[in-house]
UniProtKB/Swiss-Prot annotation:
Statement: the UniProt record of this protein carries the keyword Ribonucleoprotein: yes
Protein name: Large ribosomal subunit protein bL9
Natural source organism: Caulobacter vibrioides (strain NA1000 / CB15N)
Annotated InterPro entries: Ribosomal_bL9, Ribosomal_bL9/RNase_H1_N, Ribosomal_bL9_bac/chp, Ribosomal_bL9_C, Ribosomal_bL9_C_sf, Ribosomal_bL9_N, Ribosomal_bL9_N_sf
Gene expressing this chain: rplI
Biological function: Binds to the 23S rRNA.
UniProt GO MF annotations: rRNA binding; structural constituent of ribosome
Family note: Belongs to the bacterial ribosomal protein bL9 family.
Length: 194
């Protein structure tokens, strides 16, 4: 299907381009979202008559997104989630969770703007791209932790999962040493009378 793009569409073209796309892409994505018009003679004439207005609106939207992006770019958000000992989350962090975290801090982001290749399923610090406009993309940092204290440790660059394993190993070694010396928890010297 031939369409006229009303804004830049990644991998397809820029404002004003007359391109041929698959019917499903046009019917399910471009046309319902107002990103394109069918390339008919009437629509071509209408587009050319309104081209300056459409371009001005696009520039205004881009500038607004760039201004919003300057405030959000590089910001860090903490998400507290439950996770197992290995750092695997019970569930995952999706685009909606990222958008909600940004909105909670006063940002103007919709979940469709969040670009995640796949949901985040582990604890740690993750970089996430947010596409505010077809030409404005920013990066925010998500600090996913089990507690506020753990989030602060991760923010300092500490690998919380590895340090937890080291603490567990040290505790086990201390318990084994204590048992070997006949300290608390050993059975040496315990007398049971029947």
């Amino acid at each position: 299907m031939k369409v006229i793009l009303l804004e830049r569409v990644e991998g397809t073209g820029v404002l004003g381009d007359e391109v041929t796309v698959k019917d499903g892409f046009a019917r399910n994505y471009l046309l319902p979202r107002g990103k394109a018009l069918r390339a008919t003679k009437a629509n071509l004439a209408t587009f050319e008559a309104q081209r300056a207005e459409i371009e001005a609106r696009n520039v205004k939207n881009r500038e607004s997104a760039a201004k919003n992006g300057e405030a959000l770019d590089g910001t860090q958000y903490i998400l507290i989630r439950q996770a197992g000992e290995s750092g695997q989350l019970y569930g995952s962090v999706a685009g909606r969770d990222v958008a909600d975290a940004i909105k909670a801090e006063g940002g103007k982001v919709d979940r469709s703007m969040v670009v995640l290749d796949k949901p985040i399923k582990t604890l740690g610090v993750h970089e996430v791209k947010v596409k505010l406009h077809a030409e404005v993309t920013i990066t925010v940092t998500l600090n996913i932790a089990r507690s506020q204290d753990e989030a602060e440790r991760q923010a300092r660059g500490e690998n919380v999962i590895n340090s937890q394993f080291e603490e567990d190993r040290a505790a086990e070694a201390e318990a084994a040493q204590d048992m070997a010396e006949g300290g608390a928890g050993s059975f040496e010297g315990d007398h049971y009378e029947a």
